[in-house]
Amino acid sequence: MNTCYTVITGGYDTLKPPRIISEGWEYTVFSDKFIDVPPWGCIVTDKHNRELKIMPNAELFNNITLYVDGSIEIIGNLNKFVKEVPNRYASCKHPHRTNIMQEAEAVIRLKGCSRPLVMQQIDRYIDAGFDEPLAECCVLLRNLNDPVVRRINKLWHSEWLNSCGRDQLSFGYSCWKYGLKPYLFDQVVFKRYFKLYSHS
């Protein structure tokens, strides 16, 4: 059984039922309060949403796992999606920015992050030799049976926890450190299976 999951806390988003319920998938929402939207099963938790996004619970999940942001509606068949997209580790190519320097400027300008803190993180990545395309981590397709994927998640979690707190900045670096190039699908593929809404 594969798992699709999302995280909604603080009333930040409205959970949307998938337009198509895909055979062989279970749907799980983590939230700080109970949400009743079938076919989603709800697990009430006090964990931070980014922690659940980055480090899915190995006791609950194995095999193929799909994370979607709470602002996303699933509109396509997930079995077709995993046939189209390599499932070791995949995410969406960022539609507006191409690299972490552009993302750094965006989180400073739009999210109010500390410039010195962000640039300290970015400089460390660039000095290490990192220069990979930018992902938009609103969708994450992972094979959690893969030990390299689990190690990447652990490093990504550590980078998120000990830096400026913007997970997209450290995703690509964490994959690169373990020699894994994530598959980044484009907006044509994204729009075939998902619909993005503004945060409620």
Cite the ranges covered by each PLM segment:
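Residues that flank catalytic or metal-binding motifs in active/ligand-binding sites
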Residues: 23, 68, 135-136
